[in-house]
């Protein structure tokens, strides 16, 4: 199920962003997280899994050709694996902590 968010007045299905990233043969998996200030979404961050030496700037340029500008994430972070919580779901809070520690 896709998560619907609103950013700068645009409604965005986060799953659509993830799908475009995983359409790239270099990307094994992707998850996009909305970064909030209070209750307002201020930017999007996409975390990707890839075992390739992938150029993040090139990837962002490629994504910009298939997604509207307002759906292109501000930042892309490559990880070896996603953190999971005790319910075996991707731990989105931990992803935000990873992002903030960069």
Where are these regions (language model features)?
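AMP-dependent adenylate-forming
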Residues: 1-102
